[in-house]
Amino acid sequence: MASTASNTSKLEKPVSLIWGCELNEQNKTFVFKVSDEDKSEHQLALRTVCLGDKAKDEFHVVEIVPQVEGSDVQPVPIASLKPSILPMATMVGIELTPPVTFRLKAGSGPVYISGQHIALEEDYSWAEEEGEEEVEEEEEEEDPESPPKAVKRPAASKKGSQAKKKKMDKDEEESSEEDSPVKKGKGAGRGRKPAAKK
């Protein structure tokens, strides 16, 4: 949907509705329009054009007739359907601003056109949000001091952690030697292998 910027300070929120119409032998044209009293911006995004189950096996051509006055502008075909070949066409990127006239140029139908009717309604909740933002700004100005942020230290590299581990192992050995009673005599120190008997 192409959105245009509004000159007013009011925000617009989209309201989306499913839309559809039927073209047949009795009703070969359909005009999608909105009331003149409605000040919202409207768009019609087409999604599918499909044949009904009672459609004859003939070509059904659906076209859009421009609303421009003058004979220079030709109708634009948007789908050519036949039940045995192509019973449905998906529309992508066709977004129209009302009024839009659809016409069944060839075939007897029924042909169903569906899409999404999007209306941008004025949103007055912006005034409430703006008031809340002003209150928050005043609270921030009253309490300018904020607690200092904790600074993280960089992680130690592998070399540093290996050296630290060796140092801790050495400290543990020294502390265990200090805590243990001093051994005296021949048993102190390295042990000897008993001699083998002959």
Curated annotation (Swiss-Prot):
Annotated GO biological process: chromatin remodeling; positive regulation of DNA replication; single fertilization
Tissues of expression: Expressed in oocytes.
This protein's record includes keyword Nucleus: yes
Source organism of the structure: Rhinella marina (Cane toad)
Biased segments, Basic residues type: 150-167, 183-198
Biased composition (Acidic residues): 125-145
Protein name: Nucleoplasmin
Keyword Glycosyltransferase attributed: no
Coiled-coil regions, chain positions: none
Residue segments, region Acidic tract A3: 172-174
Lineage: Eukaryota, Metazoa, Chordata, Craniata, Vertebrata
Region annotated Acidic tract A1, chain positions: 35-38
Record-level GO cellular component terms: cytoplasm; nucleolus; nucleoplasm
Region (Disordered): 125-198
